[in-house]
């Protein structure tokens, strides 16, 4: 037996030990504890706005912290900043590469970022003296496509990539200050904790990992999905997070319990999940699916509480505003819809 086989066997044994230890700690289930809580009832949301302007599939969107402006990225090679109240376009930014897969709005509202198959995270300054939008930095260093990016502040951004790593960048210098390694498949999505000291990532190795931004360490690894994790989102209090996967389930993982608490699935749902987001309270989990719908789940009871149907193609991205008053969905049908 080769040394490699021995190590593989050892790793399997350790994994089983961890699984048993987690089982021993699981003295209760979330569904048992929440039996006395009233169900949320039927959630019916209406389309309040449709944002028309992109000419091709929308791949990503992100709300600004003002809960009014949002940025969207499409394969028409444009980044559009929208005013969701009026549906006006505040900026339409032509991109150097049209193969964009992610976009992000800085908390300050001064910058937006995007990236994709060019392996570069491009930072755009929205508040230049001349009033035009221009590239302020191009962050190159990943050796695979950029799948997700999120600003910590105006000078720091975290990115995830197909090259199996995440990275923290100093935007001023254009350098990676920390590289987060440990995944064994494309990293598809990341989500910052409310205090921005931690972030979680979901990958094609079917695992989610919790990282310490400052130390560059992987704190915890969460398994359970049976296929690629496409989407990940922190619970509003920062103690848990949800994932969406190609295995047609969403799952809730708890950082303190170090394990999965809940699975959100239905026999009728057989397609993958592209995006997940929590309501402001965390009671509702919204998930976008390949079957053109967005399902609303009762996060505590795992019941389907509603569905947002209105797109004519895959729902590729969604986001809830910081004030919790609206949700936006973006789709391959080239439209964004605002619901509440």
From Swiss-Prot:
What is this protein's name? Guanine nucleotide-binding protein G(I)/G(S)/G(T) subunit beta-1
In the record, Phosphohistidine modifications are located at 266
Q: How is it modified after translation?
A: Phosphorylation at His-266 by NDKB contributes to G protein activation by increasing the high energetic phosphate transfer onto GDP.
- Subunit structure as annotated in this protein's UniProt entry: G proteins are composed of 3 units, alpha, beta and gamma. The heterodimer formed by GNB1 and GNG2 interacts with ARHGEF5. The heterodimer formed by GNB1 and GNG2 interacts with GRK2. Forms a complex with GNAO1 and GNG3. Interacts with ARHGEF18 and RASD2. Forms complexes with TAS2R14 and G-proteins; these complexes play a role in the perception of bitterness. Component of the TAS2R14-GNAI1 complex, consisting of TAS2R14, GNAI1, GNB1 and GNG2. Component of the TAS2R14-GNAT3 complex, consisting of TAS2R14, GNAT3, GNB1 and GNG2.
> PTM N-acetylserine: at which residues?
2
What UniProt keywords are attached to this protein's entry?
A: Acetylation, Phosphoprotein, Repeat, Transducer, WD repeat
Pfam families in the record, alphabetically? WD40_Gbeta (PF25391)
> Where Phosphoserine occurs, residue numbers?
2
What's this protein's function?
A: Guanine nucleotide-binding proteins (G proteins) are involved as a modulator or transducer in various transmembrane signaling systems. The beta and gamma chains are required for the GTPase activity, for replacement of GDP by GTP, and for G protein-effector interaction.
What protein family does this chain belong to? Belongs to the WD repeat G protein beta family.
GO terms, biological process: signal transduction
WD repeat segments: 46-94, 95-140, 141-181, 182-223, 224-267, 268-309, 310-340
Q: Which PROSITE patterns match?
A: WD_REPEATS_1 (PS00678), WD_REPEATS_2 (PS50082), WD_REPEATS_REGION (PS50294)
- In the UniProt record, what gene is named as encoding this protein? GNB1
